[in-house]
């Protein structure tokens, strides 16, 4: 190659890419001064709502109802939950106003089992020994309470009697003078009777003495005596028949006297 040969033309280097333009800085906006907020008017305190008192349950507590159901059903292996529910609804249904009664009963029974008040046996429930002992102790107390209540009634009766006596007492005081007047009048009436001569009564006594000889009609008595033995069958009562024979002797004497004449 000759020196005169031209050097190879070198392409001009590509111009360097202009550097990425830096983001323009935003001019800070002039913030308007905050206006102070007007103070809020104080809220008036609300009147507290009156809480309605919860109506006291008219039924006994659940433990008492469950205990009553188990003791009255007297099932050997315990009472199931449906049996307890049925018994309680039949006996206390009018007093139970809980819509979720079945759910609350199942929850209550579970808590009683955890607390040791009930014993679960294959889906049935029995009373624990502690509850059985309490049930036995509670029965004599009721009997004693009934016995103590009866004497109170008897003690109250004498008070009424005393009150009646007190009310009657003033009436007697008012009536006493009337009785005394009546007694005076009766005494005055009785005195003229005593003045009557007793001699007038003596002839009556004499008349009575004369009337005494009525026993002459005694001979009729044998007929009555004869009538009585007819009713009596025993032979011992037949003996009175001899009596008329003795009394017939006067007739025989009269016959003898006539014969002598």
UniProtKB/Swiss-Prot annotation:
Compositional bias (Low complexity) = 1-22
* SUPFAM superfamilies per UniProt: Winged helix' DNA-binding domain
Extract the ranges annotated as region (Disordered).
1-63, 125-261
Residues annotated as region 7 X 5 AA repeats of K-K-[AS]-T-P?
136-250
Task: Extract the InterPro entries matched here.
Answer: H1/H5 (IPR005819), Histone_H1/H5_H15 (IPR005818), WH-like_DNA-bd_sf (IPR036388), WH_DNA-bd_sf (IPR036390)
Q: Biased-composition ranges for Basic and acidic residues?
A: 41-50, 143-198, 251-261
* One Pfam family cited in the UniProt record for this chain: Linker_histone
Annotated GO CC locations: nucleosome; nucleus
Q: List the disulfide bonds.
A: none
UniProt-listed GO biological process terms: nucleosome assembly
Q: Can you tell which superkingdom this protein's organism belongs to?
A: Eukaryota
Q: What PROSITE patterns is this protein classified in?
A: H15
Protein family membership? Belongs to the histone H1/H5 family.
What this chain does, per the entry, is described as:
Histones H1 are necessary for the condensation of nucleosome chains into higher-order structures.
Protein name, UniProt field: Histone H1-I
Q: Which gene is annotated as encoding this protein in its UniProt record?
A: H1-I
């Amino acid at each position: 190659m000759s020196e005169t040969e031209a050097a190879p033309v070198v392409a001009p280097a590509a111009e360097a890419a202009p550097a990425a333009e830096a983001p323009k800085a935003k001019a800070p906006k002039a913030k308007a001064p905050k206006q102070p907020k007007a103070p809020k008017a104080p809220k008036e305190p609300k009147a507290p709502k009156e809480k309605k008192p919860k109506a006291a349950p008219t039924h006994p507590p659940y433990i008492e109802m469950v205990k009553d159901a188990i003791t009255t059903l007297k099932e050997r292996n315990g009472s199931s939950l449906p049996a307890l529910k049925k018994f309680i609804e039949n006996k206390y249904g009018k007093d139970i106003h809980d819509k979720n009664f079945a759910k609350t009963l199942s929850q209550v029974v579970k808590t009683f089992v955890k607390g040791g008040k009930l014993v679960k046996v294959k889906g049935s429930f029995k009373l624990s020994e502690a509850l059985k002992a309490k049930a036995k102790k509670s029965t004599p107390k009721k009997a004693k309470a009934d016995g103590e209540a009866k004497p109170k009634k008897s003690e109250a009766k004498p008070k009424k009697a005393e009150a009646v006596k007190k009310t009657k007492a003033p009436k007697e005081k008012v009536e006493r003078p009337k009785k005394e007047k009546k007694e005076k009048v009766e005494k005055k009436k009785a005195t003229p009777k005593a003045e009557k001569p007793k001699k007038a009564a003596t002839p009556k006594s004499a008349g009575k003495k004369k009337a005494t000889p009525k026993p002459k009609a005694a001979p009729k008595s044998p007929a009555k005596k004869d009538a009585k033995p007819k009713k009596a069958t025993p032979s011992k009562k037949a003996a009175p028949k001899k009596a008329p024979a003795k009394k017939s002797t006067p007739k025989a004497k009269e016959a003898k006297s006539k014969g002598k004449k």
